[in-house]
């Protein structure tokens, strides 16, 4: 499986995160079903946006891309995403990029014009099959570079000559066509070829990449390698809006994963919120989505009280079969979450302790299959809260009760509850939490 990864010029926003968590779950499912799966997710570290960021900050593209790649990894770990099998960078695969361009030139699908190498979309009769676009209907300048030296306005650049900014930032490489750098589309084509070969099973990415990026990848790879299927299946996750508006700098509504984490929202809450709608459908990000996700996870974690979660992996209890079958049905994560809710209800209604334990173990394993319930009860409800602070408040409440100041005692109980700490008064006068 090949998935288009981030362009590392800034920290990840929730739109980026949605794509990552979708293919993270798909990767787990593929491994479960087939025993082994190879997941390649690239890092785009050669791009105009990175060059602009480096120029603005008087830095180098290597410094910018290294910094934001590290930030991306930290953010994705925070929302419980596993690392892919391979994570190639464009700058480390120039050899394969040049090789692929040479194949396209030799086969007549690419041409040189004014020191640029372009792909000729008219040379590939199936162009537009993925997106439903037709060559004669393509608008001039539709997310492809337009220039006077193209044979068709939809032709896109494979290699561009270095300019003054490229020389200043060392963002250029030697090639048979002179010093320059690759176009965006050829980078992914070359990296999927380098790590998965001419043909592989699944290609994923956001719906915004379907055209022109994925359409262009297909044209490049199938033109370079006669008879190639390239990717057998294409998977696209839906778009994400914020309060029903498209995320954009002009609207000042870009929601960064890092900002959410810094505001005290747990990574697992962010992950759950990104699962709220089917992966192919649009997702609208709102405050209520976050609060509902927090409440649901609090409810789930209360079922873990007294459970030794460290021993769960050793248990012979399996992930719910219904849960797995639901995920197999077009990765229906919202329906899988509904099954978790059903399991939680059964656990609460069951009086038989052995049955309750088995149900809880299956519940935890099922949730962990999609990256949820990775903490213990204690860790979840005391994250960011010190043991000393909890003890101090419990002691204050005890004093308030002794002084018959029950209003103060109730306020402290409510304060602890808001912190996620549930307390229970025992017959011997002690309090557990």
Swiss-Prot record:
InterPro entries: Cys-tRNA-ligase, Cys-tRNA-synt_Ia_DALR, Cys-tRNA/MSH_ligase, Rossmann-like_a/b/a_fold, tRNA-synt_1_cat_dom, tRNAsynth_Ia_anticodon-bd
Segments carrying motif 'HIGH' region: 6-16
Subcellular location: Cytoplasm
GO molecular function: ATP binding; cysteine-tRNA ligase activity; zinc ion binding
Pfam family, one: tRNA-synt_1e
CC cofactor: Zn(2+)
Name of the molecule in the record: Cysteine--tRNA ligase
Organism this protein belongs to: Wolbachia sp. subsp. Brugia malayi (strain TRS)
